[in-house]
Amino acid sequence: MSNQNTLRDVALAAAALCAAMSVIVPAVAAEKAATKPAGTYVSGDFHNHTTCSDGALSLQRLVDRSVNAYSLDWFVQADHGGSSARNCTLREDPFEPVAPALGLTNSATGPYGGTVTYPSGGQPASTGKGPNQSWQSTLPNGVADIKGDGTANPKRMWRWQEIKEFQYPVLEAESRKHNKPVWIGLETNNPGHEHTSTTILTGQLPWPKTGAGNANLMAQFEYCFDRSDTDTSRGAENQWDCSVSGSPNNSLIDPVSRKIAKAGNLGGGNSAANPDLGHIKSVEAVKWMNEKAPNTSFYVPAHLERAGVYNPTANRGFNIEHLRNFNNAAPRIAFGFESMPGHQAQEDRGGYGTGAAGGGTFGGTGAYAGLIGGVWDALLGEGRNWFFFASSDYHNRGSFGADQRETNSDFFPGEYTKDHVMVRKGKGKGDLTAEGIIDGLRSGNSYVANGDVIDRLSFVVCTANPGLPIKANQALIEKAAANAVANKGEVRIDGCATMGEKLVARPGADLIVAVAVRDPQGKNNSPYSFPNPSLKQIGVTQPLDKPELDHVDLIGGLVTGYVSPADTARYAGPIGTDAASNKSAKILKVFNKTNWTAGNDGVRTMSYRVPAVKASQYMRLRGTNLPAATPFETDAQGNPLSDWEASPVDQTVKGNIACADAACPPHMRTVAGVKYSSFDVAAWSDLWFYSNPVFVEVINGVKVAGVK
């Protein structure tokens, strides 16, 4: 909001609200407003890849694209565990930019015409150049500099050595070069399951820190707990031990490698001979993190629906009991999941085939969070601190080069998906530090948005002042939310709680839910300005690079308390079972242009009353650019449909949403001369945001035990 009078009015309204709230029905949030440090929302990404695993770019170039080209405020680089032959610390060779070089080509048939030959895999096109060169050929002493087991030629370097000796120093230098927190994590191939995004910050010194740090603990974690790391050297000169103090599972540790392993199963994963061994090892990993770095670590299962339901004799999938086990073992370490995967521009969106748990993605989100009443709602219904995150999972742009804006695989970090995280000031940590970001992720005070469908959010639940009319309560709290959005902050008023917090209220109190979002004006990062083909079906002409928020759903459910592991029927089971469901979850309210207030700078404010609250509960938000009943995209209630509805599995048949504009690019699914929404066009057409929950605990009711 640029109007000075408007800002003054909002500030006065917020001050009036503070006075009004002083006589509110007694309630508390996570902290009193006067003692809770102020903060701001900052955006970042913690799951992406370089040539040190299966990515296409060097460390330096990926960092630059993420924090410079796409302006992320923070960045965690997280390659896979295991080993790699390629040296990702080597920069790309100098080259003449390959057309279109950050632009789009022109031809007689439209701005994306097929007359240009693109280099396969991007720049560098040769596998023998830049970061595609091997460690063996680029280290001073060749193979002698590569530690641990292995006889391949060229010899592969174990990920622990890459992290400790090569990648960390580069990332520390990049962090200080860009004056932003940049540090190293790991997408671990977790035993018994598929992949998990992790970090251990202890030892690392990203900007604004100074001095020479280290990633020794991160490297040790990879050696100890990645199922693709079958090295037995104990980290060579490090002589690491992977035991957890006092754990009965230390009896499973192999005496040579000093990690949980079996003969013929050095990764310690599930197998027919060792069912569930992998999951046991993954729980030990969480416990080890909690012992070694309880305040500077996280363990966030990635694209967890992708590999299908859990199999005790294989390494795939996560059922709800595994998430509960992780959270029970260390709630400060395992506090959420990436149910919105990366790879959003792939034909099978997110890389989710029909064998994924739930059968695919729904508006780009996996079934665990994308379907109301499912796994996420079941966890929130226990009152757990289990939060929603997303990532780019950047590897490459498919058949396009890194400097081309089209993609039929991945988006760069910050190009399409952003995690917006509250980072607080003070507490001796400065304004923006890696520690503050990890604290923010752990707090649950965060939200995710694709395609900048929104770029700011304030979401708060307050007890109403019984001395004021309800409409006056709502107006005041809406003003406070709008003021918070204008300042990229949150509402900080006694008697209110925001995302990741709980409000404790007396039974019978009225609650006010207030939301303010900013639908940013102007263009997002989409390279396409032709009309959104999904909306064109219903007669709406809206450029793909100028999306507009259509509606916001307020979703809620009851909190009924933690389920005991002994209650197997309610604790364990795949998607769709009672254990993985919360039947109380539903849409409480839909906000759109008919009932929200449109303000300056794209700000939309809205509110909802919960009269005479009786039961402990939670509320969360989602929103989209697509109206309810958009064919092949949303149902009559506005829920996202399976992404296979728009783009069928069989790639040889026509899609269901035609792209008839002359500017529709040639790489789209094309059958009988007709182009159909697919790849990046489908992703830019179908945008969603998700907030994390606000909890309400009713006095003498069910405790929201997982949230302070």
Predicted regions and their residues:
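Gram-negative bacterial Sec-dependent N-terminal signal peptides
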Residues: M1-V28
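Extended, charged catalytic domains and RNA/DNA-binding interfaces, predominantly
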Residues: A29-K708
